[in-house]
Amino acid sequence: MAKDILKNQDPKLQAMIVEHSAPAPKEIPMDAPVLKRVARPLRHVKFIPIKSLIFHTKTGPMDFSYEKKIKTPIPKNKIVVRVSNVGLNPVDMKIRNGYTSSIYGEIGLGREYSGVITEVGENLNYAWHVGDEVYGIYYHPHLAVGCLQSSILVDPKVDPILLRPESVSAEEAAGSLFCLATGYNILNKLSKNKYLKQDSNVLINGGTSSVGMFVIQLLKRHYKLQKKLVIVTSANGPQVLQEKFPDLADEMIFIDYLTCRGKSSKPLRKMLEEKKISQYDPVEDKETILNYNEGKFDVVLDFVGGYDILSHSSSLIHGGGAYVTTVGDYVANYKEDIFDSWDNPSANARKMFGSIIWSYNYTHYYFDPNAKTASANNDWIEQCGDFLKNGTVKCVVDKVYDWKDHKEAFSYMATQRAQGKLIMNVEKF
């Protein structure tokens, strides 16, 4: 049986097991596999991705979001600006304080900026170009959007925007237009209504606020005010203002509100009665007595708030004078104040009947850069741009933060101790 099986051999299988004399082929050498990073292939992206700083409620945290996008191609009458710097303003905190519920979703921050144009709608190619360095105001408080994001879609017919001059840094430009325009519009209205003249006697409450600093420069350099400015400020305020504006150092008289526990009306009335005031110079550590014979004030500009000066208005403000506040009767509190909230009844009464009941004109001024109520010949955007370009005014920057340090920036602003603008750098995305 076994012999029969061995005889029955398959010649094909037998050929496969025969040992051949030819050597086996050499193994082809191969390098060890190495992973290499390669460029991502081009894709036809139909939107511009955005990184933005947002919040949901006033008590919730601020955080970064990547949900927003700008669709391309952009509208014909709009431009895209890649934001490089953003100026912080108290209105940012007031807007945030108004959101007590998260039902509105993501809320943006930031109202003024500087940056570079990256996209131009086809109808605007005659006026704007890719690469233009610009600055402007992005003010849409009721739309829950802000400019603290990597790119913004701007409508030049609605959003104030200007080319940034070489003499103004990106950080200075980002912190200029909102407060400068506030101050200029106040003074422009006072001048047109004959309240502000070259020989007017002016009191400024809050001289180291950003609006206050711009107003000081405008009054002296643009409106050519002849008399010295009386400025209510903190203990180191005089030193800050004299260092920032050395050409105006002798044009200012200072009242330290801390020495009178916030009741600045007391030293003001004393100055008017005695016709002199004591000024302390911390640098030279000496005290000087200045004569003051100007009498009551023609214009009072309040950037702090409070009722103290108003309560003594009969002894401080001239008949036919003007009192303008950007805050109201209550002292500003950035942690609690809400955007667009009502004044108290007495303030509302003054606004309606002030010129009848009292001897001066009372105005609670709100700056709305998108409002169409201004007169047709009020070209405040171009005028403010010229002020910055020709050096009439300069933005005083207190501190600059990277936007990853946004908690520190907003915490510092909440202390209400900033003496100048707070600027946030926005990284490219």
Swiss-Prot record:
It is found in: Cell membrane; Membrane raft; Golgi apparatus membrane; Late endosome membrane. Signal peptide: none annotated. GO terms for cellular component: Golgi apparatus; Golgi membrane; late endosome; late endosome membrane; membrane raft; plasma membrane. One of its GO terms (molecular function) is oxidoreductase activity. GO terms for biological process: protein targeting to membrane; protein transport into membrane raft. SUPFAM superfamilies: GroES-like, NAD(P)-binding Rossmann-fold domains. Pfam families: ADH_N (PF08240), ADH_zinc_N_2 (PF13602). Interacts with PMA1. Lipid raft-associated protein involved in the targeting of PMA1 from Golgi to the plasma membrane. May induce clustering of PMA1, which facilitates partition of PMA1 into lipid rafts after leaving the ER and its transport to the cell surface. This is Protein AST1. It comes from Saccharomyces cerevisiae (strain ATCC 204508 / S288c). The gene is AST1.
